[in-house]
């Protein structure tokens, strides 16, 4: 994912999680 949400998205992306 793009990491636009704190709980979903790439953990390397800004504000991203590790879901």
Swiss-Prot record:
Record key words, sorted: Adaptive immunity, Blood coagulation, Coiled coil, Disulfide bond, Hemostasis, Immunity, Innate immunity, Secreted
Modification after translation, per record: Conversion of fibrinogen to fibrin is triggered by thrombin, which cleaves fibrinopeptides A and B from alpha and beta chains, and thus exposes the N-terminal polymerization sites responsible for the formation of the soft clot. The soft clot is converted into the hard clot by factor XIIIA which catalyzes the epsilon-(gamma-glutamyl)lysine cross-linking between gamma chains (stronger) and between alpha chains (weaker) of different monomers.
GO cellular component: extracellular region
GO biological process annotation, one example: adaptive immune response
Disulfide cysteine pairs (residue numbers): none
Compartment(s) of residence: Secreted
Superkingdom per UniProt: Eukaryota
Quaternary assembly: Heterohexamer; disulfide linked. Contains 2 sets of 3 non-identical chains (alpha, beta and gamma). The 2 heterotrimers are in head to head conformation with the N-termini in a small central domain.
Known role: Cleaved by the protease thrombin to yield monomers which, together with fibrinogen beta (FGB) and fibrinogen gamma (FGG), polymerize to form an insoluble fibrin matrix. Fibrin has a major function in hemostasis as one of the primary components of blood clots. In addition, functions during the early stages of wound repair to stabilize the lesion and guide cell migration during re-epithelialization. Was originally thought to be essential for platelet aggregation, based on in vitro studies using anticoagulated blood.
Free-text comment about domains: A long coiled coil structure formed by 3 polypeptide chains connects the central nodule to the C-terminal domains (distal nodules). The long C-terminal ends of the alpha chains fold back, contributing a fourth strand to the coiled coil structure.
Protein name, as recorded: Fibrinogen alpha chain
Organism: Bison bonasus
